[in-house]
């Protein structure tokens, strides 16, 4: 993609490759007056600023707290916005200084070169699709803010969860800068997993009511079971752990180094334990994204199939270990709920664990003989296609079960699962009610509001102004969010904004999935994003965790651009 500006900013500047394939060493100037040393120096400065910001966001952001859970939303938001605003300020200052130097020393040739590449960006690439979609998302959010009856609240998000236009703008700008100008470094993966493991371990100790941070002393006893670690509400906590789980699973599955494989496996085990002990139903969706999506990457090789079987066996082993701990320390643990409780109560669980480890061990020992006897088991395109058929069949069965339980009124057939299959106002802690009423409110919007919504993060204002009494009477609750990120965006930034956001997620994940560089952190970012995206169908975007999603998308796309062929360095 020789005309792409986003590729231009991602290549090693010790070599400069022009569109004709000619290479200039860093000690020479091109015919157009470009200086490789100047470009390398500029690139180093920009990458230094971005790397420091990533270091703070990957390590400090997940762990920072102030006054227990009482102000955790404000604390995370303030840290994130200060970090990004500081990064933008330094980047702007650098840009001005470099532009002045370029003007004085090189007659502005580098600046003109940069802007010429931006104007001639290749519009046929998946990179451009993601960039265009996120731009539509931002423009729609800006128009939504201007058209909102609560313009100030829509901009700052101070009447909601601080997810107004200001925060959305920080997401988009940081995405553009990191994905376009940051040269990927493998340490970002290690930092993310290290801080993530700490968050998970703290959450695990909270499950055993150790309260090592002392946060539970400052909240009501009735709230102890639903606030944990350095994240807060268990729904938000398991959303974050899902990011760690998806990232570590992909890294473990693709790693060749024995020591790093052990490290990623330990992170995976910790994340499995943490997400199960988090006792939130959105964990099932994160796991569905992980175990449903990994085979499309791993089933191409025998090694990948073996790693997938190992991951599956590990999950059931962790569940079994938690069950044993629950029986050994019944007075210490909070206890499992919902589907995980059904699984641990399954009497044959130990045999399930042994079965999966037996399958994994057997496959590891015998897989080399499958190529002739059973080619579909040795990995490859056919194996992936078989999995795709099984996935389609599984989704079909699930759809039938929903139809059978709701339309055919055969819910009794499904025993403990009927609480998940029967969709009513009470489904998902009254999510059924707020989803239904949210869509009804959207249908009542005038055309302009259907397109651009009520204003970013103004759902609470909308709900209190229209359905407050009905909401309290029906559920006994006051909802300030739709408990579904996509429905939330549909009402607050309209069809245009929510479509732009969804298209951005799909385009970015498609780009990462098609990457052929072999960089495992790109696939780690892909599965972290996929786990988050699926669980957000029962959750909302908050500045406690959502910044990490945008970081995953940013570094994943940066990796894709850096590894793309025929790159042109412009910084």
Predicted segment positions?
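Non-cytosolic membrane-interface motifs at loop->transmembrane helix junctions
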Residues: 76-77, 155-164
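TM-adjacent membrane-interface loops and short helices in multi-pass inner/ER membrane proteins
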Residues: 233, 425, 429-479, 493-497
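Alpha-helical transmembrane segments of multi-pass inner-membrane proteins
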Residues: 25-29, 33-67, 85-100, 135-151, ...
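Short, hydrophobic transmembrane alpha-helix segments
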Residues: 65-79
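Short, charged juxtamembrane terminal tails flanking transmembrane helices
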Residues: 565-571
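Transmembrane alpha-helix boundary signature
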Residues: 96-123, 144-156
């Amino acid at each position: 993609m020789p005309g792409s500006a986003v590729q231009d900013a991602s290549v090693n500047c010790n070599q400069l490759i022009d569109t004709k394939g000619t290479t200039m060493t860093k000690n020479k100037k091109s015919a157009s007056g470009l200086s490789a040393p100047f470009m390398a120096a500029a690139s180093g400065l920009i990458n230094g600023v971005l790397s420091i910001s990533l270091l703070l966001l990957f390590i400090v952001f997940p762990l920072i707290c102030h006054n227990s859970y009482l102000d955790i939303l404000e604390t995370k938001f303030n840290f994130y916005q200060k970090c990004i605003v500081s990064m933008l300020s330094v980047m702007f200052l650098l840009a001005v200084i470099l532009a002045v130097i370029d003007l004085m020393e090189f007659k502005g040739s580098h600046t003109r070169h940069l802007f010429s590449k931006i104007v001639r960006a290749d519009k046929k690439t998946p990179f451009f699709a993601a960039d265009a979609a996120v731009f539509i998302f931002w423009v729609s959010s800006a128009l939504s803010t201007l058209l909102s009856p609560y313009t100030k609240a829509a901009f700052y998000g101070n009447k909601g969860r601080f997810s107004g236009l200001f925060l959305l703008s920080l997401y988009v700008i940081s995405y553009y800068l990191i994905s376009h100008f940051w040269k990927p470094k493998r340490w970002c993966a290690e930092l993310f997993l290290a801080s993530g493991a700490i968050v998970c371990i703290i959450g695990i100790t909270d499950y055993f009511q150790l309260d090592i941070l002392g946060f539970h002393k400052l909240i009501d006893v009735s709230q102890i079971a639903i606030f944990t670690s350095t994240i807060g509400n268990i729904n938000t906590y398991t959303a974050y752990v899902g990011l760690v789980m998806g990232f570590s699973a992909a890294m473990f599955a693709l790693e060749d180094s024995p020591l790093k494989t052990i490290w990623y496996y330990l992170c995976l085990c910790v994340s499995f334990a943490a997400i199960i002990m988090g006792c939130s139903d959105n964990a099932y969706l994160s796991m569905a994204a992980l175990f449903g999506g990994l085979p499309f990457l791993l089933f191409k090789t025998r090694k990948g199939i073996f790693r997938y079987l190992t991951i599956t066996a590990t999950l059931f082993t962790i569940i079994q270990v938690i069950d044993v701990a629950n029986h050994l320390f019944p007075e210490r643990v909070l206890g499992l709920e919902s589907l995980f409780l059904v699984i641990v109560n399954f009497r044959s669980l130990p045999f399930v664990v042994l079965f999966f480890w037996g399958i994994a061990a057997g496959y590891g020992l015998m897989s080399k003989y499958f190529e002739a006897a059973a080619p579909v088991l040795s990995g490859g395109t056919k194996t992936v296609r078989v999995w795709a058929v099984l996935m389609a069949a599984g989704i079909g069965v699930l759809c039938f079960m929903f139809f059978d339980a709701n339309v055919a009124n055969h819910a009794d057939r499904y025993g403990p699962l009927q609480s998940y299959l029967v969709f009513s106002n009470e489904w998902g802690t009254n999510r059924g009610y707020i989803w239904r009423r949210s869509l009804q409110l959207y249908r009542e919007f005038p055309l302009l509001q259907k397109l651009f919504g009520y204003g970013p993060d103004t759902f609470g204002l909308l709900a209190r102004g229209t359905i407050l009494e009905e909401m309290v009477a029906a559920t006994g609750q006051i909802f300030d969010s739709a408990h579904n990120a996509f429905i939330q965006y549909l009402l607050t930034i309209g069809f245009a904004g929510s479509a732009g956001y969804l298209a951005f997620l799909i385009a970015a994940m498609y780009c990462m999935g098609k990457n052929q560089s072999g960089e495992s952190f790109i696939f780690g970012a892909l599965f972290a994003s996929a786990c988050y995206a699926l669980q957000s169908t029962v959750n909302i975007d908050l500045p406690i965790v959502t910044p990490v999603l945008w970081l995953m998308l940013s570094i994943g796309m940066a990796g894709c651009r850096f590894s793309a062929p025929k790159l042109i360095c412009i910084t």
